[in-house]
Every structure is written in C-alpha cells, then in structure tokens.
Amino acid sequence: MANSEKTAAVAEIAEDFRGSSAAVLTEYRGLTVSQLTELRRALGETTRYAVVKNTLTKIAAAQAGVTGIDELLVGPTAVAFVGGDPVEAAKGLRDFARANPALVVKGGVVEGKAMNADEIRRLADLESREVLLAKMAGAMNGSLAKAVGLFAAPLSQVARLAEALRAQREETAGAEPVSVDA
C-alpha cells in the first residue's frame, strides 16, 4: 500500500470514528466472504462494517480523539462503525456471533467511552432507546393518574361526609329529642 493510499485510508477511518455514535471492534478470522456479507446486511444501512489494518486504525483513532482501543487492535480486526442506535448494532453483532462463533467481539467505543467485550454484551442486552422511552412515558402516565386520584380522593371524601351529615340531620330532625336524666 502506497503512502498516499495509507493517508487516504487513515482519513477515511478517522472520519468514520468521528461520524459514529459507536465503533465495535471484532475478530472475523474464520468467517467466509458470504458470512461477512450476511453480517453487513444484518447490521443495517446505518452501520458500516469494515476490515481494517490495526496500525492505520490506531493512527486514525488518535486523529479522531478516540482512546482506549489500542489494546484491542491485535490480530485480524474489523470495525462496525455505528451511525444509528448502538444498542441495536450490539444486538445485531451478538445475534450473528451466536450463529457464527468465529465472530468474536473484542470491545469498542460507545459515545466516546471505551468498552470491553463484556460491556458491549451488556449493551446488547439493553432494550432499545425507543422502548425505554415508551416504558418511562407509561410509568409517568401511571404516576400522573395516581396523583390525580390522590388529589381527587380527599375532595370526594369531604363531599361524601357532607352528604352523610346532611342525611343524618334530616333523619334526626323528625325524631323526638332524647333527654338524658342524671
């Protein structure tokens, strides 16, 4: 690879790091070309999966301000540059790795934070951002309904008490007064 090609490759990888919400590093040794194509399809259009040279990736990461991945750049490496939801990409990699054990997740960077392979697996176990937001909205809606019930309850109790007192006075108005002799 000529120097100009290396410079262009470093610039492209650095731009991928800058434009991604996450970058997950994997070892792809043992996967066929058709399996890599299947993985790219499974990750979707917002994720670019690229086989990279470790040395060029280290330089590009440094240029992009990405730290904590140098120790992951050992052996054959491919990077999933995630443009969309990091959780969805982590799930895609996890599911593909279950079906194809040759794919090994090494770790990565999510929103500027370096993560090891276990942290990426935990990320894959999370629910998507949309599901979490929907659950939070549902919980808030339930809490608001409970709060309205709590505020309305004292008023309705006062109204029921006033009605009971009125009914009691109407009943006692027609009764003879009771005298207490001592």
UniProtKB/Swiss-Prot annotation:
Q: What UniProt keywords are attached to this protein's entry?
A: Ribonucleoprotein, Ribosomal protein, RNA-binding, rRNA-binding
Q: Which GO terms describe its biological process?
A: translation
Q: Gene3D superfamilies of this UniProt entry?
A: 3.30.70.1730, 6.10.250.290
* Origin superkingdom: Bacteria
User: Pfam families annotated for this entry?
Assistant: Ribosomal_L10
Cellular component, GO, one term: large ribosomal subunit
Q: Does the keyword Heme apply?
A: no
Any one GO molecular-function label of the UniProt entry:
structural constituent of ribosome
Quaternary arrangement and interactors, per the entry? Answer: Part of the ribosomal stalk of the 50S ribosomal subunit. The N-terminus interacts with L11 and the large rRNA to form the base of the stalk. The C-terminus forms an elongated spine to which L12 dimers bind in a sequential fashion forming a multimeric L10(L12)X complex.
Q: What name does this protein carry?
A: Large ribosomal subunit protein uL10
Instruction: Please give the organism.
Output: Parafrankia sp. (strain EAN1pec)
The root-end lineage is: Bacteria, Bacillati, Actinomycetota, Actinomycetes, Frankiales
